[in-house]
Amino acid sequence: MPEQPKKVADRYLKQEVLGQGTYGVVFKATDTKTEQTVAIKKIRLGKQREGVNITALREIKMLKELKHPHIILLIDAFPHKENLHLVFEFMETDLEAVIRDSNIFLSPADIKSYLLMTFKGLAYCHDKWVLHRDMKPNNLLIGVDGQLKLADFGLARIFGSPNRKFTHQVFARWYRAPELLFGAKQYGAAVDVWAVACIFAELLLRRPFLQGNSDIDQLSKIFAAFGTPKADQWPDLTKLPDYVEYQFVPAPSLRSLFPAVSDDALDLLSKMFTYDPKARISIKQALEHRYFTSAPAPTDPAKLPKPVPKQDGKSSYGKHEAITVQSPPRKLRRVMPERGRVDSLKSHVDKDQQAPMSLDFTILAERPPNRPTITSADRSHLKRKLDLEFQ
């Protein structure tokens, strides 16, 4: 006999589980008042019922203020049985599932459509002085109508205040800008732009672009793709807290990494992957780039291809040939700094990994990747009274 739906706080009829994470579970439900299908994120509150972890508190605060067609709608929030429930509009899938599905052919017009929706949502955030700080394909949700929406604002912050410092341990590593990997604590919207550039590349390649297995290795992947930055490219590089000098590696042509893309797409990618965050194109400027006005026109979201649900949950990554960048000779790969600087940099490598003394410059791995999560971000809990009033 199938499991009977369970009611949550009387109004919502819980159905199947959609996913699980560190803090709780997301499940599909029906709003018995409106008959609307919704997604409910259940988050453990902890010992004090009035308390809430800081990530959930920030997400509620941000989403109550951000209202846009390409940002997920938070419908309701309520505590129930020592859990906090966040009620969102139901979204059918996410961009990661689209990229992974080898049965889906993504045309240049399809890719442009997904990027246009992503850029519009992020531009709205930046107009409101909000950094997302966790841009990645599985945080870009797609509805039954094909509309893409930014989700997961737990790491979002208000920016723009002079001298305000943030943690540099944000974003999943593969989407982390080089200034963050070098320990920058004062940064702005450019970090989101770099992450979206990585998503752009992932849509083109149908696999993650820069797959580092530590912060040091992530930098090696970036330098292999774009060359070691020079002083005239990034004047403030040596001032960053965790700066370490690397042996110069020449950049391959961007065309060699993306051989099939249009000149306009390649030009936009190069501007988004600019090393110096002060010179990196803004998301608003990116929306005005000729890539979005040149042919082909973006696909109507309602006509975008959708992934077929996989019963075994296996990834289709790893079925394509890897694109690699030739490494320089091992002894020239990195200039070894003083011992103290090495120890400083090692402190940013995951505890269960050793800082590699030689670096692998492969851009795309052959094996199915283990997608990293933000394990090093501040996960402390704050006990606060929670405003759950919705207009």
UniProtKB/Swiss-Prot annotation:
The modification Phosphothreonine is found at residue 167. GO terms for cellular component: nucleus; transcription factor TFIIK complex. GO terms for molecular function: ATP binding; cyclin-dependent protein serine/threonine kinase activity; protein kinase activity; protein serine kinase activity; RNA polymerase II CTD heptapeptide repeat kinase activity. Residues 294-321, 337-391 are annotated as: Disordered. Residues 309-321, 337-353 have a biased composition (Basic and acidic residues). It is found in: Nucleus. InterPro entries: CDK, CDK7, Kinase-like_dom_sf, Prot_kinase_dom, Protein_kinase_ATP_BS, Ser/Thr_kinase_AS. The keyword Disulfide bond does not apply. It comes from the Eukaryota. Expressed in roots, shoots and suspension cell culture. SMART domains: S_TKc. Changing residue 41 to R: Prevents autophosphorylation. ATP binds at residues 18-26, 41. The keyword Kinase applies. It catalyses: L-seryl-[protein] + ATP = O-phospho-L-seryl-[protein] + ADP + H(+); L-threonyl-[protein] + ATP = O-phospho-L-threonyl-[protein] + ADP + H(+); [DNA-directed RNA polymerase] + ATP = phospho-[DNA-directed RNA polymerase] + ADP + H(+). The active site is at 134 (proton acceptor). Changing residue 161 to A: Reduces phosphorylation by CDKF-1 by 20%. Abolishes phosphorylation by CDKF-1. Interacts with CYCH1-1. Binding to CYCH1-1 activates CDK kinase. May form a stable complex with cyclin CYCH1-1 that phosphorylates human CDK2 and the C-terminal domain (CTD) of the large subunit of RNA polymerase II. This is Cyclin-dependent kinase D-3. It comes from Arabidopsis thaliana. The gene is CDKD-3.
